[in-house]
Amino acid sequence: LAHVERVFDRQSGIHAPHLAPTLQLHSPHAPDAHVARSMARIARGIDANSWQSLVGTRSFWASGADLDAYVGSLAALRAPVWMVTMANELVTDQVPDLENTEAYAGLCRTVHSLSMRSRVIVEYGDFAALPAVAAGADTVGSGWDRGQRTFDPMAFQVDSDPGIRIPASYVTQGGLNSVLRRDTAEAIERWDSSHARRIRGGPMPPSDQVQRMHHLAQLRGAVRQINGAGPDKASRVAQLRARYSTAAADYDTLIARLPRIVRDPDKSAWATKPSKVLEAYASSEGL
């Protein structure tokens, strides 16, 4: 109780909505899961309008029926807003890792359930969270820095060598739901400028600063497109399914025309695996 009260006091001090604290969960049956649920209930007792949060690793989200039962007990709190997060153990080059289809489908089922009564935000989601938007989330977390677009535990560590580093440059390809290296984007531009503009979603960002705003605009457009299908989950899934189909076809063309520049692993990470997550979720819900 005292911990939740301190958190709420600090949030009130900066005029932020009350967001209940939580723990990173590995299993719905672990002691931490019971503690997290107790904190959620305490927070609701203090402020019935408090937002709630749910953070889990892949093992948590992949726990099937046990996950669904746990989420059902949380949905009963009827929080106005739920913020959910896929916690990664390791992040490589900030490329989405949706290899564990079961885990991401579990997150989507959770969003589906919570969205029946609450608004749902997927934190640290970016383009990898589009299947969760189809499942009912209306907002995804992102940022101007690539490290803000996925939950990387190392991002919260103190850097023992804060020397000057020159990061690689990237360009968001909105039509591909992807972020590719700038030299790849330039190769696509040289191959076919009109095709490049279409899949990029606009002119080539001349600088990394412009690219940051371009990225957020492309992501916002994708989320709005899915939200535009309305609350019906089947319609939202159909909207994203069509988007992934177009991206896959464009990737096939690029891989054929620009071999060794646009590669199969790019398509797999940004199009194929997210599409598999969408279909796994849709199948589980009869969509």
Features from the language model and the residues they span:
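Glycine-rich phosphate-binding active-site loops on the catalytic face of alpha/beta enzymes
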Residues: 15-22, 124-157
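Alpha-helix-loop-beta-strand connector modules within alpha/beta enzyme cores
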Residues: 35-51, 102-120
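C-terminal extensions of enzymes
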Residues: 193-287
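Glycine/Thr-rich beta-alpha phosphate-binding loop at enzyme active sites
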Residues: 67-108, 135, 149-164
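Flexible loop/turn segments at secondary-structure boundaries
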Residues: 26-28, 60-61, 90-93, 128-131, ...
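C-terminal structured domains
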Residues: 142, 147-221
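Acidic carboxylate-rich catalytic motifs and surrounding loops in phosphoryl-/glycosyl-chemistry enzymes
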Residues: 85-90, 122-128
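Active-site beta->alpha loop and helix N-cap motifs at the rims of alpha/beta catalytic domains
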Residues: 1-82, 86-88
